[in-house]
From Swiss-Prot:
Organism expressing this protein natively: Staphylococcus carnosus (strain TM300)
EC number: 3.5.4.16
Residues carrying the site annotation May be catalytically important: 176
UniProt protein name: GTP cyclohydrolase FolE2
Gene name as annotated: folE2
Keywords in alphabetical order: Hydrolase
Annotated metabolic or biological route of this protein: Cofactor biosynthesis; 7,8-dihydroneopterin triphosphate biosynthesis; 7,8-dihydroneopterin triphosphate from GTP: step 1/1
Catalytic reaction list: GTP + H2O = 7,8-dihydroneopterin 3'-triphosphate + formate + H(+)
Domain of life: Bacteria
UniProt-listed HAMAP family: GTP_cyclohydrol_B (MF_01527_B)
GO biological process: tetrahydrofolate biosynthetic process
InterPro entries tied to this protein: GTP_cyclohydrolase_FolE2 (IPR022838), GTP_cyclohydrolase_FolE2/MptA (IPR003801)
Length: 292
């Protein structure tokens, strides 16, 4: 039989090996503890970015609450050993209210708080999440929720924004022009994955629908858009539209670029289009970079 009372939680813990804490000699009061991170001497190099990543936190994107995955960083001078990383979460909490609403303005406010709280000259953030939006079937006009992946990137140095980026990843349908040309019947098609990274002019005024503008350039130039709900009239429309608009991966990336290059608030962009080939075991892809 056990020497402990197994009808109690504490007894079971002791039965499985738990012991009393020791009487330590090190301080237990914060003010008396050694703060190694705040050590000041010559540590040879300054650090451009140091912080935390893979922080999952509730965010709000266009009225939908979702999970955001964050990477926060600040600079670190040559004379400081380290940063107090707990202050990063404290800075985020100051702007949290049942979900941090994702916008460049809100993220900039968080970064300025972080700069001051960490007593550093610069700070940066990258945050990814699901963007949900209403999507209506093309003929029957039935509403459902579509989604795309978005990543905001922002950096500040003092009062200046030094980096402003938005990445959108969405899926579309692409129909093969070669297959259509050589086949007696129909053509093979597949799902295409498009990733667009926009480099935004920090001094420019963004339109309120900037995410929709980017998504439209991606989807409108594909063979067809993807829809959550399709009834038979919708499926007929989608199938025929794809056949009317065949796209090689090379065609798609150039057409998207032609739309994005017209945006006066963009300094440049990176695009990758990847087709998950339906008649091969490999994918097809194309990449394009453009700077104004």
């Amino acid at each position: 039989m056990s020497e402990f009372d197994l009808t109690t939680r504490e007894g079971r813990w002791r039965h499985f090996g738990s012991v009393d804490p020791i009487e330590g000699t090190k301080p237990t009061v914060k003010e008396e503890m050694t703060d190694l991170q705040s050590t000041h001497k010559d540590f040879l190099f300054e650090i451009e970015e140091v912080g935390i990543k893979n922080l999952v936190y509730p965010v709000v994107i266009d009225n939908y609450q979702t999970a955001g995955t964050f990477a926060f960083s600040t600079s670190l001078t040559r004379e400081e050993k380290g940063i107090n990383m707990s202050r990063i979460l404290e800075s985020v909490e100051k702007h949290y209210d049942n979900g941090l609403e994702l916008s460049f303005n809100n993220l900039e406010a968080v970064l300025h708080t972080l700069e001051k709280h960490m007593k550093q000259s610069s700070a940066g953030v990258d945050v990814s999440g699901k963007w949900f939006f209403n999507r209506y079937s093309p003929v029957t006009n039935i509403k459902a929720v579509g989604n795309a992946d978005v990543t905001y990137g922002l950096a500040v140095a003092g009062d200046q924004v030094t980096r402003k980026e938005l990445t959108v990843q969405a899926t579309v349908t692409t129909l093969c022009p070669c297959s259509k040309e050589i086949s007696e019947y129909s053509a093979h098609n597949q799902r295409g994955v498009i990733t667009v990274k926009m480099y935004i002019d920090p001094s420019a005024t963004l339109p309120t629908d900037y995410k929709e503008v980017i998504l439209d350039a991606m989807e409108a130039n594909a063979s067809s858009i993807l829809y959550p709900i399709l009834k038979r009239p919708d499926e007929k429309r989608v199938t025929e539209r794809a056949y009317e608009n065949p796209r090689f991966v090379e065609d798609l990336i150039r057409l998207i670029a032609a739309d994005l290059v017209e945006l006066d608030w963009a300094e440049g962009f990176d695009i990758e289009c990847r087709n998950e080939e339906s008649i091969h075991q490999h994918d097809a892809f194309a990449k394009l970079k453009y700077r104004k």
